[in-house]
Amino acid sequence: MSEVSYDILENPEPNSHLWKQWKNLVDTEGWTSDDNSVTALTPSMPSTRSVWAVSKTAENDFVGCVIWNEYNKICFLGFFLLAPEYRGKGVGSVIWDIAMSRMPADHTLGLRGVPSMVDKYRKKATPFVGATLENYKMKVAEYHASMEKMTGDNFKLVSHLTPVEFDQLVRYDSDVNGRNRREFLELYYKLDCVLGVVLFDQHHKIIAHISAVRTSHKEDNVFKIAPLYADSPSIAMSALRVFSGVMFELHPEADVLFHLLDVGSGAFLQSFFQSLEIIPAVSGVTLFSNEWPNKGDLSKVFIAHNNSCHFDY
């Protein structure tokens, strides 16, 4: 193994050039689960912690990083990433060990490992296996066509919600995932790359929430649909139908990705997409250092938000 020279840096400022280099590599790696809202919010989230290896040059360029978010007694590790030319040279083990030493002892470590890394992560720090994440990809036009025969509901763009309606959305989100994510949702919906819709029943009560956000490089024109929380399977399909129309109007040439977990009501949508003969790919396996019981109401989770800035499922 050739010797590699680098420096260690912890918790760089949100405006550091390292974050731009990190985002570019995340998008280039094709980690579509880590959408543009994740890469936009992570640098400035109060919960973000990070350890970096940087080059021993005046530029201090990106070599590698471990990035996690601390909240609700969990350290959710969203990124363990090395520049390609530094892989297999021992840098990863060094920054991993430093990161592990920085995490509170009373917190559970959680992460989603790509299939090739699951065994390694289980042996290192996270032996408890949780949900598996699969993704289904289709054209927006195909998505819209598959939904045209379904009925819709009274809906409203999240960007058009009144303050009272947004408060109701925060409560609905909390009921589903068992966490108060107000601060995160407020930041999430300020991003230009995010689009969201809620469905109301006849009493103007929220019965579904669905969102989309760009993922990967902008020129790839790919959107990740997440979350989809809904009161029932029929309402979930109504939300998908409504949202297909919104997406088709705004981004008719785009691709959409649905990352589904094998918990909650994810199996319902897995069956639906398989009926369309879409072959899924496994994005990752959820791993924890300790037992981590699910909170909230899993029956309403058709698509998890799957955002490491504030983990839901």
Curated annotation (Swiss-Prot):
Residues 6-152 form the N-acetyltransferase domain. It comes from the Eukaryota. GO terms for molecular function: acyltransferase activity, transferring groups other than amino-acyl groups. Disulfide bonds: none annotated. Signal peptide: none annotated. InterPro entries: Acyl/Acetyltrans_Enzymes (IPR052729), Acyl_CoA_acyltransferase (IPR016181), GNAT_dom (IPR000182). Pfam families: Acetyltransf_1. To the C-terminal of C.elegans F21C10.9. This is Uncharacterized protein F36G3.2. The lineage of its organism: Eukaryota, Metazoa, Ecdysozoa, Nematoda, Chromadorea.
